[in-house]
Swiss-Prot record:
Component of the probable ECS(SPSB2) E3 ubiquitin-protein ligase complex which contains CUL5, RNF7/RBX2, Elongin BC complex and SPSB2. Interacts with CUL5, RNF7, ELOB and ELOC. Interacts with MET. Interacts (via B30.2/SPRY domain) with PAWR; this interaction occurs in association with the Elongin BC complex. Interacts with NOS2. This is SPRY domain-containing SOCS box protein 2. CDD domains: SOCS_SSB2 (cd03719), SPRY_SOCS1-2-4 (cd12906). Belongs to the SPSB family. GO terms for cellular component: cytosol; SCF ubiquitin ligase complex. Residues 26-221 form the B30.2/SPRY domain. Residues 21-34 have a biased composition (Low complexity). The SOCS box domain mediates the interaction with the Elongin BC complex, an adapter module in different E3 ubiquitin ligase complexes. Essential for its ability to link NOS2 and the ECS E3 ubiquitin ligase complex components ELOC and CUL5. It comes from Rattus norvegicus. Residues 1-53 are annotated as: Disordered. SUPFAM superfamilies: Concanavalin A-like lectins/glucanases, SOCS box-like.
Length: 264
């Protein structure tokens, strides 16, 4: 796995690598992704919900795929069948680059988030009930109309990540974070402060006849014991705080311990 970022705090606003320098993966993510994937029945159990989508969306293959009908001036969304309030969850979204259009947003939503709008927009993330990453524009949306939306992942001004066909969504309901992973590298937290909610996989789309697939990769619960090494590392990093993590390399510690504390 690549280096990752987890944000701290209680606000469900977008987070930024520039603001949160704690580059660490959610505990258990590597183990989750290394485990055998759920069987086809479980995949469908966690797939798109044909009863919880815009009227312009057709869910296919028992929930593994949906197709948006070519309706003009409409943005259409869909939720997954299962909502998550506990545990660490990951799922793969497959969305061809040529089928994204002007607004292709991937993320999560509560059961109250709207699933259709009579115009083209980043519907997912447009109000307080959803959180999304526009994989075409590289912007994060929550309670947003698109103005001054933060870039994700954070980088030099004007630079934007090209998101390939497949990406992973990583929802950690124990820490209350939502992030994304591409090519085996977790990009860090996009949103934080999500604890206490029930959130469903969701996307919103504008491209006529686009087909978006979902593949649930599994769950890891907090009840599964964390290693003493990992807990010790968290305690040390928490004691130092974000502003002093850069001083780890100057501490009188063995090189191997310094590397471990820095996730190297």
């Amino acid at each position: 796995m690549g280096q990752t970022a987890l944000a701290r705090g209680s606000s469900s606003t977008p987070s930024s690598h520039a603001l949160y320098s704690d580059l660490s993966p959610p505990e258990g993510l590597e183990e989750l992704l290394s485990a055998p994937p759920p069987d086809l029945g479980a995949q469908r159990h966690h797939g798109w919900n044909p009863k919880d989508c815009s009227e312009n969306i057709d869910v296919k293959e028992g929930g593994l795929c949906f197709e948006r009908r070519p309706v003009a001036q409409s943005t259409d969304g869909v939720r997954g069948k299962r909502g998550y309030s506990r545990g660490l969850h990951a799922w793969e979204i497959s969305w061809p680059l040529e089928q994204r259009g002007t607004h292709a947003v991937v993320g999560v939503a509560t059961a109250l988030a709207p699933l259709q709008a009579d115009h083209y927009a980043a519907l997912l993330g447009s109000n307080s009930e959803s959180w999304g990453w526009d994989i075409g524009r590289g912007k994060l949306y929550h309670q947003s109309k698109g103005l001054e939306a933060p870039q994700y992942p954070a980088g030099p001004q004007g630079e934007q990540l090209v998101v390939p066909e497949r990406l992973l969504v990583v929802l950690d309901m124990e820490e209350g974070t939502l992030g994304y992973s591409i090519g085996g590298t977790y990009l860090g937290p996009a949103f934080r402060g999500l604890k206490g909610r029930t959130l469903y996989p969701s996307v919103s789309a504008v491209w006529g006849q686009c087909q978006v697939r979902i593949r649930y990769l599994g769950e890891r619960r907090a009840e599964e014991p964390q290693s003493l090494l990992h807990l010790s590392r968290l305690c040390v990093r928490h004691a130092l705080g974000d502003t002093r993590l850069g001083q780890i390399s100057s501490l009188p510690l063995p090189p191997a311990m310094k590397r471990y504390l820095l996730y190297k």
